[in-house]
Amino acid sequence: MSSSDLVAASIQGNLDEQISQLMQCKPLSEPDVRALCEKAKEILAEESNVQPVKSPVTICGDIHGQFHDLAELFRIGGQCPDTNYLFMGDYVDRGYYSVETVTLLVALKVRYPQRLTILRGNHESRQITQVYGFYDECLRKYGNANVWKTFTDLFDYFPLTALVESEIFCLHGGLSPSIETLDNVRSFDRVQEVPHEGAMCDLLWSDPDDCCGWGMSPRGAGYTFGQDISEQFHQTNNLKLIARAHQLVMEGYNWSHEQKVVTIFSAPNYCYRCGNMASILEVDDCRGHTFIQFDPAPRRGEPDVTRRTPDYFL
């Protein structure tokens, strides 16, 4: 075995130890997080704004720091790397274990880069995480904001969208009046904080709606888009389905626009109080799809969190 092979094996072994530690909901040290994120940055920088993904793959929605429910998701859907996963953003904020959740997903990405795709959600941003919990959690668990800064710098590199077998377009939020084609998405520079407006913002913030055309979003960012918009986007880009997350749906998944758009939400009993089911979408070798719904994992003793995070649209 060459010296480079030995180094690679050592790094891999160390990663496996870190993943094992994280699976027990134990955070990594600050230096380990920094080294992990540097490696992840190299991998993610090579990925496209529209990252191609092969089937079979299991598509997942928001996790929001609900670590034990993520562990349940892996128990039901299969462990990585036995199952390929595509996560559509919002790993942090609201739940009590954002640090462990996002660190585990990034560690799995570094260990199995071809098996896991992690997209950016609207909560993978500096501004949002300072309000909805991740920043405060990092301060509480590490005593400073260094880990928060390390992760929010890494978030700039997360791909914005993915394309499964050239026919299922996956993203966190929704469509944009600034984007007609997937090539439009491929062409812009994503390595930045999520802007307040424009195409990149819309991809992470928009929602499907029953009304036709484009509408003002009640969220204050992105747009609402009607079935006519979805149909045109499907036709222009030869798509079969748009899969997205971003909205709480009580059954864990919800069809809209005559099954041209599906919302997938993977945080059961969201915020530990909403009473919803979660789901994941399995896309098989033949591109058939199956939804798997699941309930919350048993509650553990939750940490004392004195500061209540403000509500916004769920």
UniProtKB/Swiss-Prot annotation:
**Reactions catalysed according to its record:** O-phospho-L-seryl-[protein] + H2O = L-seryl-[protein] + phosphate; O-phospho-L-threonyl-[protein] + H2O = L-threonyl-[protein] + phosphate
**Location(s) in or outside the cell:** Cytoplasm
Q: Which residues form the active site?
A: 123 (proton donor)
Q: What is its EC number?
A: 3.1.3.16
Superkingdom per UniProt: Eukaryota
- Which InterPro entries does UniProt cross-reference here? Calcineurin-like_PHP_ApaH (IPR004843), Metallo-depent_PP-like (IPR029052), PPA2-like (IPR047129), Ser/Thr-sp_prot-phosphatase (IPR006186)
The residues the record assigns to binding Mn(2+) 1 are: 62, 64, 90
Q: Does the keyword Transferase apply?
A: no
Its required cofactor(s), as named, are: Mn(2+)
Annotated GO CC locations? cytosol; nucleus
Stored SUPFAM superfamilies: Metallo-dependent phosphatases
Q: Indicate yes or no for the key word Metal-binding.
A: yes
PANTHER family per the record? SERINE/THREONINE-PROTEIN PHOSPHATASE PP2A-RELATED
The name this protein goes by in its record: Serine/threonine-protein phosphatase PP2A-5 catalytic subunit
